[in-house]
Amino acid sequence: HPGFTRKVQHPQRAQENPVLSPDRPWEGEAVQAWGSVLHDDEEGILKMWYLGTGHGRSTICYATSKDGVSWDKPDLGVVSFDGSTANNIVYPPTGDVHDIDPWGVIKDPLEQDESRRYKLAGYRQLPAPPDVPEETPDMDREARNARRKILFDRIRDRHGMCAAYSPDGIHWTVDDTVLVPRAGDAGSLVYDPMARRYLATS
């Protein structure tokens, strides 16, 4: 377009790295942010939704920042962890590391339904059917492989891309519908205002 030029900027690694570390019990051993950071133009801050993993269960947590380097983890009082809601968890630990892994969160200014102002897309593996036997430590290799084959056949369409909605980015409702079966466990979510369509990649 006349009058515009493209210029590639070279990112500089922040000396403060890592800017987010798992320093709370509910965050486990690692934090993963994927693409879940946005700038809230109305509030003038950055918001992050990240996954705490490595403790046999997953938690989705929330943090805010003014500069993208120093992040605050507010006590939200939403989810109980070890008997206390003094934490920044917005989605409870379930014991299943693949409950929902957030790919990305968007704040949709055009949404008419206030309860769906924030939208999250992510990977989710729904629980296995009750007739699939549990894997036990005493299973031999043949029995374990047989169980996993049954499990894979039964959950073929029970995992993939799912969505969640929120009025404020803190209180979430997860839709159990698998929107894109067998989608991968990492991706992104954006909104194209020109085409008025959502785009998810996996």
Predicted regions, residues:
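Carbohydrate-active catalytic/glycan-binding domains of CAZyme proteins
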Residues: 1-202
